[in-house]
């Protein structure tokens, strides 16, 4: 009765249903694991052969027997072996799909070994493709080398929409997500990665990529990106491509085992001795049924207890981790005691907020340089009493921004509440903001090309953290040169989150009736319609990239330049194939032309008018860090007619506020890092 009262009848029924489905799934997967592997294809070119009584034949049988033995590396899903001596040496490997158990792996390898000499009876080299594994051997030493022969391409029977725009958008999404998975796989020890991305509320993209783990990082990445590129022209909603060295697949349904992704379990203990080559043992078919039943019962009981305990704890805590309301933020402030600073300490550090210590001023207050008694230098933002940043926003800033820890974000060190005083303390940036160096003729020489390239990459890393890698998904909405601060080593740190918004778990865009930001950096869809998303941040990043390369403000152009802004100027140079004319003359003779042109290309991709055409920041970061990623052709940048904005007289960087519809207060502002 306690359980019924705790869950309710409907909840209890749901729980029983869940357990039933779990057991059904478990039994189904157990049964499936004992089935024969699903054969896809094989390739055994008839270029060279061997006789049945030759030394090569003996070496091959030795190698295959090793793969089918109980001592094979089923737990890692990969093994390579060389048997014999030159010229009769045989090199071989097996590779199991990274989401499968050691039992399924051993079953597939043993099965493929048993079939190999039937499918390719006398060929010296062969590769066998199964749903669960790949088996390969050759008289050549192919280890740690990418092989682009023996290709297998399979396609989903369903085509993508015949509408050109929808088709291109789908392909772009698939390619960017699969390339991200390829990058993750190449940088992992197992050379394996999966992706799961919601395309719409009804469609989810699943992807899987894998290399043989003996490949170097760059070789794996090159193989996978080539594999992915081979699938894109098929224009299908799903496809897979195999080479002996790597393979990739995407579908709109879950084709891999999501629950098994992770560190492989230890290899099972198989009874008996090494099986003969002609009849390798297939583990899993002789299991003890009594043990299986006991295991299922115990598993079900443990699952039930775990669910009851979880629900009981959930009833006790009733705590959500989504965007906090003002009252919740107020409660959480109690947990931020470690960040709360004594007002008098800050007052002393800034010499009572002396005018000589003032280093910046913006719409939300003034910024002072301070020095604590231990010698630590800090930046102190003192919010003005008539600031638009209210009590709830201030609390949200302390609670949320304190959790954003990244080397390319300015760090919040503490806060203080004293009467009407609202003070925020940040790490001090001795080189101030990017615009102070980039657009100052006397200081521009401090930024050579390598430093500018490092700044571009650092900004991308910071945005990637906000959009994808942090616990919260945060849209900055005001990325510009004055909001990129530089530390003592000219490393960039994103600042000023006063206009930022938190997105929910499944949220991809939002709208606002009060458009705030800086013209020239605003994406067209935001400036004209109040629509913002991760892609609007990408647009602002693209403008920053072009400013960093050219050393010119987006707003510094006039009619004498023959262009209204930096984007128009860049686009004309690009279409005239004179992109290098954009480069700041101060660095033109000390930079790699190919690297600069690639950055210009990336910048133009980011500022395309259609948000769907812009790459995600993760794709941008991959483009910046790997020259093997193919860049698509950029479309024309976003252009829009600027209405007469209402300038904020307190903002020295000409941030603007445009009222597109009856205005409301800036809802859900997160924080405001100096300077403004």
From Swiss-Prot:
Pfam families: CR_prot_dom_plant (PF22812), Pkinase (PF00069), Stress-antifung (PF01657). Residues 35-291 are extracellular. One of its GO terms (biological process) is plant-type hypersensitive response. Residues 313-676 are cytoplasmic. ATP binds at residues 359-367, 381. It is a single-pass membrane protein. Residues 1-34 form the signal peptide. Residues 640-666 are annotated as: Disordered. The chain crosses the membrane at residues 292-312. It is found in: Membrane. The active site is at 478 (proton acceptor). It is an enzyme of class 2 (transferase). The keyword Repeat applies. GO terms for molecular function: ATP binding; protein serine kinase activity; protein serine/threonine kinase activity. Its EC number is 2.7.11.-. The modification Phosphothreonine is found at residue 518. Keywords: ATP-binding, Glycoprotein, Kinase, Membrane, Nucleotide-binding, Phosphoprotein, Receptor, Repeat, Serine/threonine-protein kinase, Signal, Transferase, Transmembrane, Transmembrane helix. It catalyses: L-seryl-[protein] + ATP = O-phospho-L-seryl-[protein] + ADP + H(+); L-threonyl-[protein] + ATP = O-phospho-L-threonyl-[protein] + ADP + H(+). CDD domains: Gnk2-like, STKc_IRAK. Residues 353-639 form the Protein kinase domain. The keyword Kinase applies. Belongs to the protein kinase superfamily. Ser/Thr protein kinase family. CRK subfamily. This is Cysteine-rich receptor-like protein kinase 8. It comes from Arabidopsis thaliana.
């Amino acid at each position: 009765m306690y359980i019924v009262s705790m869950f309710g009848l409907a909840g209890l029924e749901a729980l029983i249903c869940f357990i039933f489905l779990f057991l059904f799934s478990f039994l189904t997967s157990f049964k499936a694991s004992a089935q024969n592997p699903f054969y896809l294809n094989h390739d055994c070119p008839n270029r060279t052969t061997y006789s049945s009584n030759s030394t090569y034949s003996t070496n091959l049988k030795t190698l295959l027997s090793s793969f089918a033995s109980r001592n094979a590396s089923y737990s890692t899903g990969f093994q390579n072996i060389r048997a014999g001596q030159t010229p009769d040496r045989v090199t071989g490997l097996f590779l199991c799909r990274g989401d499968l158990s050691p039992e399924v792996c051993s079953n597939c390898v043993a099965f493929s070994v048993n079939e190999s000499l039937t499918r390719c009876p006398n060929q010296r080299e062969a590769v066998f493709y199964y749903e669960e594994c790949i088996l390969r051997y050759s008289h050549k030493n192919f280890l740690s080398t990418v092989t682009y022969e023996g290709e297998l391409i399979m396609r989903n029977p369903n085509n993508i929409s015949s509408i050109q725009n929808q088709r291109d958008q789908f392909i772009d999404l698939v390619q960017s997500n699969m390339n991200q998975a390829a990058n993750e796989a190449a940088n992992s020890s197992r050379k394996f990665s999966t992706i799961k991305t919601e395309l719409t509320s009804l469609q989810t993209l699943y992807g899987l990529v894998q290399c043989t783990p003996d490949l170097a990082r760059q070789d794996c990445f090159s193989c996978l990106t080539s594999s992915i590129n081979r699938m894109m022209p098929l224009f299908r909603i799903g496809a897979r491509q195999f080479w002996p060295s790597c393979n990739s697949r995407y579908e709109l349904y879950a084709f891999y085992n999501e629950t098994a992704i992770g560190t492989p379990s230890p290899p099972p203990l198989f009874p008996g001795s090494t099986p003969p080559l002609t009849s390798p043992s297939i583990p899993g078919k002789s299991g003890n049924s009594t043990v299986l039943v006991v295991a299922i019962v115990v598993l079900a009981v443990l699952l039930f207890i775990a669910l009851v305990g979880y629900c009981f704890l959930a009833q006790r805590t009733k705590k959500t981790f989504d965007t906090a309301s003002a009252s919740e933020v107020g409660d959480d402030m109690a947990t931020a005691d470690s960040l709360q600073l004594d007002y008098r300490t800050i007052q002393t550090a800034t010499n009572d907020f002396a005018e000589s210590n003032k280093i910046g001023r913006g719409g939300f207050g003034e910024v002072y340089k301070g020095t604590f008694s231990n010698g630590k230098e800090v930046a102190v933002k003192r919010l003005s009493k008539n600031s638009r940043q209210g009590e709830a926003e201030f609390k949200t800033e302390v609670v949320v921004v304190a959790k954003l820890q990244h080397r390319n974000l300015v760090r919040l060190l503490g806060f203080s509440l004293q009467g009407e005083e609202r003070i925020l303390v940040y790490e001090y940036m001795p080189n101030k903001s990017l615009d102070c160096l980039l657009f100052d003729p006397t200081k521009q020489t401090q930024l050579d090309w390598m430093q500018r390239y490092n700044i571009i990459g650092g900004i991308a890393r910071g945005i990637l953290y906000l959009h994808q890698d942090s616990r919260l998904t945060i849209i900055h909405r005001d990325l510009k040169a004055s909001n990129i601060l530089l530390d003592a080593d000219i490393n960039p740190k994103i600042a000023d989150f006063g206009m930022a918004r938190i997105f929910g778990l499944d949220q991809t865009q939002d709208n606002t009736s009060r458009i705030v930001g800086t013209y020239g950096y605003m994406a067209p869809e935001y400036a004209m319609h109040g629509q913002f998303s991760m892609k609007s941040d990408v647009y602002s990043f693209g403008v920053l990239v072009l400013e960093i390369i050219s050393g010119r403000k987006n707003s510094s152009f006039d009619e004498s330049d023959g262009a209204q802004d930096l984007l128009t100027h860049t686009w004309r140079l690009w279409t005239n194939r004179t992109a290098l004319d954009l480069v700041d003359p101060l660095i033109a003779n000390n930079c790699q032309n190919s690297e600069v042109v690639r950055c210009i290309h990336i910048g133009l991709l980011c500022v395309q008018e259609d948000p769907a055409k812009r790459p995600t920041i993760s794709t941008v970061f991959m483009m910046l860090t790997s020259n093997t990623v193919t860049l698509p052709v950029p479309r024309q940048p976003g252009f829009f007619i600027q209405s007469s904005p209402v300038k904020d007289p307190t903002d020295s960087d000409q941030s603007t506020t445009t009222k597109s519809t009856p205005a409301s207060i800036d809802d859900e502002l997160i924080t405001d890092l100096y300077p403004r």
